[in-house]
Structures are given as C-alpha cells and as structure tokens.
Amino acid sequence: QRLSRGLGDVYKRQTYNKDGAEWFKTTEFEDDKDRVLLRENGEPTYYLTDVGYHKNKIDRNYDTCINIFGADHHGYIPRLTAAFDVMKKDHQNIEFLLYQLVNLYEEGIKKTMSTRRGEYFSLSDLREDLGPDVIKFFFLEKKSDHPMDFDMDLAKDESKNNPYFYAQYAYVRCCSILSKATFDPNSEINLKEIENCFEIVSKTINYPLVLKEYALERSPHSLVHFVKDFSATFHSFYEQNPVLCDCLLYTSDAADDDH
C-alpha cells in the first residue's frame, strides 16, 4: 500500500477496483490492457514495484536509467512507459535494451533446460566452472538482438582458437616486452619505425575515442570486437618483428595503460 500511495494523486485518478483488485488505467496511454497494481489479497504485483522503482529513479533526477530485459519480455516496455505517461513523468532518459537468449553447448551438444522440470544451468554454475572474465567476454561478444551459442569447451581452450585467451596473451606479451627493456614513453620515437607499424599505433591511439563511442551507443559487443582485432594485429606484428623496437615499446606501454 505504501508503494501505491507513493504514486500520489495519480493513483486516485487513474485506478479503479475490479474483482477485489486495484487496476491502473494504462489503456488510456496506448497500453493494450489495464494492469493490476494490487491483487485481491492486497499483495502488490511485480508491475507496481517496477513502476514505483522507476518513479523513484525519475524523482531523484537520474541522468540515465538503463533497463536490460530478456527479449521475451519486450511486451513489458509499453506497460512501463504507459505508467510514466499516466504519472506525467518524462521518461526520455529511461532506456530499454533487449537481449536474446543464450544457448549452452558442451562437447558439441546443446544443453537442454526446463524450469518446469527443474533442469537449468545457472550463471553462478558457469562462473565457478570458467571464471567471471571469460564469461563476460563471450557474453558481450554478440549484439544484444542476436541469439548466442556459448561453447563451453571453447571458453576453456587455452589456444588462439579461444578469442578470450588470445586477447589475454596479447596483454601478457605487452607486459613481457616492457619488463625486458627500459623505456621512457616521453622520449622521442623513431618515426620510420612508426611508419612500419602505423596500423597498430593508430588502433592504440584511437582506443579512448572508440571506447567513448561504444559506451554512448550501448554497444559493448563492439568493444569486444575491437579487442579481438587489436590482439590479432598485435600478435601478427610481434611475430614479424620479434626484436625490441621503439614501436613495440610504445604500443605495449599504451596498451598496458589502457587495458
């Protein structure tokens, strides 16, 4: 009841009682049907708590509120926006990102799951088995509106076939290079050597810019692809130029600072 009272005068104007429950008149704001706020037994619905939570966010003047929903909950978005309209709340800074489902594969076989039968594989299970970093890397690799096939065997593989391992190995190589040489990042750089590795240097210089761009676009998958591309470029250059040079030192130092 405190939640419903928190909606203020709007609650009185835009609700009605039906079959012992209290309903919100969201159809007046382009929702496909009115929504229950309080059940017959007086218990609040998830909808009421979500509306109250977002109202609190809006009232506290948050710059941005990002909601991440499963794609199967896309119908929930108009319900919430209708509630904001009912309350005459500006919701321009509230964003909704929809993510598709994840399919787990082990030994080439898709793992079947059913909540009804109590058969499922939790994220905590994956974390214990693989560690959090590799999970984040693979889960962020796909664009949110694309389904994902997560290969558990590939995630465990310690070879260049595993993009996460390959990216880590690039960082290890950077650290190894810096540990073997004395390098002052403020010293003059041999421009001829820079010309020979323009691609890798330009990627390093552009990293802060693309990071900001990906954040504003809400596209973490683009950052993962940038890391994969940079790692491949670095490994290729390293293998072609095994001898320490100004370019390798400069790039390694920059990569270490930005990792």
PLM feature segments, named:
Residues 5-8, 12-252:
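Non-catalytic interaction-recognition regions
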Residues 2:
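Cationic, low-complexity basic patches in intrinsically disordered or flexible, solvent-exposed regions
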Residues 253-259:
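A short, hydrophobic C-terminal helix/tail in secreted or cell-surface proteins
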